[in-house]
Amino acid sequence: MTHGRVNPDFRLEDQGITGLGTVYYNLIEPDLIQYALARGEGSLGKGGSFLVTTGKFTGRSPKDKHVVKTDSVADTIWWENNREMSPEGFDQLYTDMLAHMEGRDYFVEDLTGGSDPKHAINVRMVTELAWHGLFIRHMLRRPDREDLDDFIADFTVINCPSFQADPAKHNCRSETVIAMNFDKKLILIGGTEYAGENKKSVFTLLNYLLPEKGVMPMHCSANHAVGNPVDTAVFFGLSGTGKTTLSADPARTLIGDDEHGWSDTGTFNFEGGCYAKTISLNPEAEPEIYATTEKFGTVIENMVYDAETKDLDFEDDSLTANMRCAYPLHYISNASQAARGGHPKNIIMLTCDAFGVLPPISRLTPAQAMYHFLSGFTSKVAGTERGVTEPEPTFSTCFGAPFMPRRPEVYGNLLREKIATHGATCWLVNTGWTGGAYGTGSRMPIKATRGLLTAALDGSLADAEFRKDPNFGFQVPVDVTGVPGILLDPRRTWDDAEAYDRQAAKLVKMFSDNFEQYLPFIDEDVRAAAIS
């Protein structure tokens, strides 16, 4: 039995998926919420939001992501970073997952990834949970209803949380599995209810496909000046570094908060919504994001709330520090409906420095920008991955290693070409610690970060006096209006300057040791920009 609107020539049966219970195609938000409530998947929150918990999986499982190793991708996948799965293991996984799905009801959403029609892909999302359908309707882009009659997916994603993989049988690591088969244009997800796996699977897919078209896929947020898409800025960074918060600037138009492409015509969002962290969310500092938590259809994931009043507790991280809300882009009043911008005028690389060494903002040369892009230094922030309970310094190349199927140089060279062709001023912004390392120092004040970014984006920072950092070689402003001068010189924020020097030397060595892996693949100017 089927319900909903679908291309009559492209039902699940036409894809060889049969024997299911009722299949619900392309239900809209009210219907998905009704089914989710009736099935006991969650509770209704204030304003019609949907409150849900995801069990033991409250973050991504990057170690359980696999790519099927076939002849077509054997030479293009970065296997040191992507776990391989045999074609035979995948086929058995698919067979067993379909057998597990028999007789169960499923929800199908036909959506697109990419706001630029020239580079968009059609994605069919098949979900066991109704609220996952709601989530992915927010995250990807919705075709017009009449276009569903002719919709044919380029790739299909099947998410079955109740299915558990068998490592010996399916050639995977654990009972949780995310398996991508580029030949069969199929992604299988099992053993986890964490909704972020859905969107990141599509992101990984686009990260593989788009470089062949000369498009730079980016783990970044983006905005542009009001009424002036030419003045576009992108914000690279891992989860928890401030991409969503800092790009949601009321003085600028939001393009998107997490995943974008940079083509020959400019910047475009892959998604149709936002997936914001809500821990310590403040209505004064982030009023737009805070307001979405009481809007109809917003998915509130893994937040503690009062059972009687449905009031959310933004400070209680007993379920996870990775509490989130997912909502459509149009819930942000200053969001771009086209979700597109020009070529980036400013490129901001966000890092959460748990060592407390890096200044709050630094200007980079193009060679330094490629160096820091390939390095991807930051700290894993609590909760974004399973097992991370406090910040851990790490190097995540391209500011998103878990989502990069190709070698880092592919993305680094694309970025370098785009900067050379279109020009951009590049900045490294530390949203991490100041006055000491994690545990002794304090988090960089968001007011100061916003002030520095405003000065960078409006061009006034370019006129400031800069000094060369003795440890890292980049340019650091000496004085910026509205920002305490002591913040601009990290060494001065420490009580013990010699302790800072030791910490800085430690971080410099970490950078140097990490970058050795890229030396054979880079040009001399980038090698010269390397920290040593």
Curated annotation (Swiss-Prot):
Q: Supply one GO molecular-function term.
A: ATP binding
Which positions bind Mn(2+)?
Answer: K200, H219, D258
One GO biological-process annotation of the entry reads: gluconeogenesis
Q: What does this protein do?
A: Involved in the gluconeogenesis. Catalyzes the conversion of oxaloacetate (OAA) to phosphoenolpyruvate (PEP) through direct phosphoryl transfer between the nucleoside triphosphate and OAA.
Query: What is the protein's given name?
Result: Phosphoenolpyruvate carboxykinase (ATP)
- Cellular component per GO? cytosol
Q: What is the predominant subcellular site recorded for this chain?
A: cytoplasm
* Presence of keyword Translocase: no
Which UniProt keywords are present, listed alphabetically? ATP-binding, Cytoplasm, Decarboxylase, Gluconeogenesis, Lyase, Manganese, Metal-binding, Nucleotide-binding
Positions of ATP binding? K200, H219, G237, L238, S239, G240, T241, G242, K243, T244, T245, E286, R324, T449
- Reaction catalysed by this enzyme: oxaloacetate + ATP = phosphoenolpyruvate + ADP + CO2
Residues the record lists as binding substrate = R60, Y194, K200, R324
The cofactors it requires, by name, are: Mn(2+)
Q: In which pathway does it act?
A: Carbohydrate biosynthesis; gluconeogenesis
Cell location: Cytoplasm
| Family to which this protein belongs | Belongs to the phosphoenolpyruvate carboxykinase (ATP) family.
Q: Which Enzyme Commission number(s) are on file for it?
A: 4.1.1.49
Q: Which domain of life is it from?
A: Bacteria
Q: Name one Pfam family in it.
A: PEPCK_ATP
UniProt remark on cofactor binding: Binds 1 Mn(2+) ion per subunit.
